[in-house]
Amino acid sequence: MAALESPLPGTPTAMRNAFGNVLSVLILVLIGVLAFSIRLFSVIKYESVIHEFDPYFNYRVTQFLSKNGIYEFWNWFDDRTWYPLGRVIGGTVYPGLTLTAGTIWWGLNSLNIPLSVETVCVFTAPVFSAFASWATYLLTKEVKGSGAGLAAAALLAMVPSYISRSVAGSYDNEAVAIFALIFTFYLYIKTLNTGSLFYATLNALAYFYMVCSWGGYTFIINLIPMHVLLCIVTGRYSPRLYIAYAPLVVLGTLLAALVPVVGFNAVLTSEHFASFLVFIIIHVVALVYYIKGILSPKMFKVAVTLVVSIGMVVCFIVVAILVALVASSPTGGWSGRSLSLLDPTYASKYIPIIASVSEHQPPTWPSYFMDINVLAFLVPAGIIACFSPLSDASSFVVLYIVMSVYFSGVMVRLMLVLAPAACIMSGIALSQAFDVFTGSIKYQLGASSNSTDDAEDNTSTNNAPKDDVSAGKTDKGEEIVKERSSKKGKKKEREPADKPSVKAKIKKKALVLPLEASIVALLLLIMLGAFYVIHCVWAAAEAYSAPSIVLTSQSRDGLHVFDDFRESYAWLSHNTDVDDKVASWWDYGYQTTAMANRTVIVDNNTWNNTHIATVGTAMSSPEKAAWEIFNSLDVKYVLVVFGGLIGYPSDDINKFLWMVRIGGGVFPHIKEADYLRDGQYRIDSEATPTMLNSLMYKLSYYRFVETDGKGYDRVRRTEIGKKHFKLTHFEEVFTSHHWMVRLYKLKPPRNRIRGKAKKLKSKTSSGLSSKSAKKNPWV
């Protein structure tokens, strides 16, 4: 039947299909160009630099990989971070991004294209955004056809949520992980539709690449088992479902265990237990279906009872083992981030270091409109379209959007996972809507032309001569008997052929809308798309393209560039010893190591809460106690970020309460209430003495009153409480041009002792001189 339905070569249908395929390829190429080019605003407006904080660590690791090779990379012990502990890089990093960029750099240099490692890192994310758009097309095409796929790919190429993590210079794990996520889902749906073991193997390999790239791979290994369980419960089990799932669990788990940062966690942590439980269930169901096919109904009932009994015993044993493993862990076998997703209040109660990260906070309603814009209104229509008709593939994308909406509501970072699902649903909705509206317009225009033709035919027949009519009557009279008998037979033959066409016409007419309504709706959809494009271009150009290391401000005098961070790191690099240790809050650890090449105490990896709490305690303590803590860590310089002069809100004073909370979680003498006045965080004259005497306050506001004579903080919009004070244990060595970064050096203990000795000596000498003056007879 399939061969009969396929159009013959050279026919209009075949030509139309060939033209459609060529046009689809051309559109996909343009979508890839759009996805790449819309992410280049940061390079055009600023320069080719790495953005944010985490990308600097990835850039540094890629530099090491390209210089020393993969074997040195796996065994690299980095003594520049987490002093004096250090860090084993090969076993604590997701290597997918680094290996991808390193391979691209090696391939280009092999072809005599001498690009620097930094250039490759800057443009990796825009390139993979094009790949992600094409993967979205493939996934949506498997669900609802090529029209929906093209629409979804175009939407993903521009969606602001994805742009925020894939602009040029955003060299983070999500740059390649979102492509891996979508491609893994596509191969799962492809295997589900075809039942091909080849695609199942590719699916396991794509999952392995996702595991290498990002810790968010646990979303895949939980979402797919949920879909398999949904299909089993709703009676949609098939051999294709088994082929799509079983190889993924077996091969995927084995491959995931090869990644050093995952290792045995692939089988020992609670995030993976759902996949193993569903793996057992699908085998029990497959066994039941197999037995049903080879046994009689009576024997089948007996066999089912036996299989279910054995299956329940096995499940009980497995559940008991899992419960024992979970009970042996203080967190129930879950990681802190996973627990914060299941219980949104968990991090704020027990792990403040996780809650202190801005991207781990729940999003606000405006952020949904900012990040997915009009897609939020199209998603419900896409969900409805997936239910008509409901298939295994469409049920998967519905489950995907539901779960991603929940997780994005818990953690703003996971808006990135929601973006592809929203684009897929919106693409399906737009495709269905355009099909209905354009079909209605075509039908209405065709019906109007047919009615005019029928009217012309009727007028011509009415004007026919009467003699011809009478002659026709006599001829017909002779053949009446023959025609009646033949018509009876023809009626019976035509009836079954006519009935389906009538039903099809009725069905078509149910989807036909009035011409005016279709045109208006089509114009509204085009306007909605134009509004979406304008918003996405604005978000790419203004909101998400500014690198955090270089800031700009627009005023009446023109554009002001604040390059204080690079200025400070350059000063550290040129004016300090290579082995000097720099203490700062963990946000700036990666940048300090990568740009200044100096050893830091803590960085953005945040793997050791006690070490971070030690730095937080030092910042929260009085100057003398802080000096003792830093001196015990062999710290030479302290870096503080301050925005009170220019109005930079992401400074250390605004982060200070998190330092207090994290420090107080390990060292009980640090209490948040001591830094608050009537429950309010203040730095003015009403601030508490503990706050005014803390090291963070002193290092931020030292000599600040000299800038305007009042000490007015533009971020907190108030005058500071303690304006005139001196530092006894620290000395200022560098303050950037706009006072954004301030560097202080710890005074050596012998200098301070000598200073005290000099004071004592001067006092004694002055006392002796006064006494001798009294005894001097010449005075």
From Swiss-Prot:
Q: Where does dolichyl diphosphooligosaccharide bind?
A: 413, 590
Where can the motif DK motif be found? 652-659
Any ranges marked Lumenal in the topology annotation, and which? 39-124, 164-174, 212-216, 265-272, 327-364, 411-414, 540-779
Where is the protein found, in the record's own terms? Endoplasmic reticulum membrane
Tissue-level expression = Expressed in the root and in the shoot.
Q: In which domain of life is the source organism classified?
A: Eukaryota
Task: Give start-end positions of Basic and acidic residues composition bias.
Answer: 465-501
- Which biological processes are named by the entry's GO terms? protein glycosylation; regulation of response to osmotic stress; response to salt stress
User: Region annotation Disordered: residue ranges?
Assistant: 448-501, 754-779
| Required co-factors | Mg(2+); Mn(2+)
Q: Name one GO cellular component term.
A: endoplasmic reticulum membrane
**Residue(s) at site: Interacts with target acceptor peptide in protein substrate:** 54, 359, 655
Q: Does the keyword Lyase apply?
A: no
Question: What InterPro entries does the record point to?
Answer: Oligo_trans_STT3 (IPR003674), STT3-PglB_core (IPR048999), STT3_N (IPR048307)
Chain span(s) of sequence motif WWDYG motif: 585-589
What glycosylation sites does the entry record? 597, 604, 608
Q: List the disulfide bonds.
A: none
- EC assignment: the record states 2.4.99.18
A Pfam family that the UniProt record links to this protein: STT3
Q: Which residues lie on this side of the membrane: Cytoplasmic?
A: 1-17, 144-145, 195-196, 234-238, 293-305, 388-393, 437-518
Site, as annotated: Important for catalytic activity? 165
Can you quote the domain comment?
Answer: Despite low primary sequence conservation between eukaryotic catalytic subunits and bacterial and archaeal single subunit OSTs (ssOST), structural comparison revealed several common motifs at spatially equivalent positions, like the DXD motif 1 on the external loop 1 and the DXD motif 2 on the external loop 2 involved in binding of the metal ion cofactor and the carboxamide group of the acceptor asparagine, the conserved Glu residue of the TIXE/SVSE motif on the external loop 5 involved in catalysis, as well as the WWDYG and the DK/MI motifs in the globular domain that define the binding pocket for the +2 Ser/Thr of the acceptor sequon.
Q: Which family does it belong to?
A: Belongs to the STT3 family.
Q: What is this protein called in UniProt?
A: Dolichyl-diphosphooligosaccharide--protein glycosyltransferase subunit STT3A
